[in-house]
């Protein structure tokens, strides 16, 4: 699984005219599921995201997690994180999970974050979404359960 994690002061997802998920201070997490991913990848990613210390403590050091600050998490599915642009100009998505598997593991990831006590909002799987955010920092972290980066 891959994730782009952004520290935000607020974020929301709109589908059509409806806001389907919105948070205040916390993390916006774009999640992509790979074709070889398993529930172990979900567990690794949920553990990493929930404990990622990218919020500043009283000394100005990045030392606090989203849990530590009682922040919120907005999770948005994004299969394009598996886009491969090494050949040509058009991305190939052959490494992305098929929709049924992608949805199941995406939902498992969200469930695991909630079990860790986090307030989690979501986008809408397979929908065309407009994501609005105020990036705080900016702080953007890339995660990959295969530890490619």
Swiss-Prot record:
It comes from the Bacteria. Its main location: cytoplasm. Pfam families: Tyr_Deacylase (PF02580). A motif (Gly-cisPro motif, important for rejection of L-amino acids) lies at residues 137-138. GO terms for molecular function: D-tyrosyl-tRNA(Tyr) deacylase activity; Gly-tRNA(Ala) deacylase activity; Ser(Gly)-tRNA(Ala) hydrolase activity; tRNA binding. One of its GO terms (biological process) is tRNA metabolic process. InterPro entries: Daa-tRNA_deacyls_DTD, DTD-like_sf. It is found in: Cytoplasm. Disulfide bonds: none annotated. It catalyses: glycyl-tRNA(Ala) + H2O = tRNA(Ala) + glycine + H(+); a D-aminoacyl-tRNA + H2O = a tRNA + a D-alpha-amino acid + H(+). GO terms for cellular component: cytoplasm. PANTHER family: D-AMINOACYL-TRNA DEACYLASE 1, D-TYROSYL-TRNA TYR DEACYLASE. A Gly-cisPro motif from one monomer fits into the active site of the other monomer to allow specific chiral rejection of L-amino acids. This is D-aminoacyl-tRNA deacylase. It comes from Thermotoga maritima (strain ATCC 43589 / DSM 3109 / JCM 10099 / NBRC 100826 / MSB8). The lineage of its organism: Bacteria, Thermotogati, Thermotogota, Thermotogae, Thermotogales.
């Amino acid at each position: 699984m891959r994730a782009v994690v952004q520290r935000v002061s607020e974020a929301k997802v709109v589908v059509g005219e409806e806001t389907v998920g919105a948070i205040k201070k916390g993390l916006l997490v774009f999640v992509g599921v790979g074709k070889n991913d398993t529930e172990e990848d979900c567990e690794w990613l949920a553990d990493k995201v929930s404990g990622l210390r990218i919020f500043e403590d009283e000394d100005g050091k990045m030392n606090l997690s989203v849990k530590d600050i009682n922040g919120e998490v907005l999770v948005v599915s994004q299969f394009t994180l598996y886009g491969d642009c090494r050949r040509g100009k058009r991305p190939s998505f052959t490494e992305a999970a098929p929709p049924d598997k992608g949805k199941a593991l995406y939902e498992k990831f969200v469930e695991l974050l909630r079990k860790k006590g986090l307030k989690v909002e979501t986008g809408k799987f397979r929908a065309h979404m407009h994501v609005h955010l105020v990036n705080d920092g900016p702080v953007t972290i890339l995660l990959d359960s295969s530890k490619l980066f």
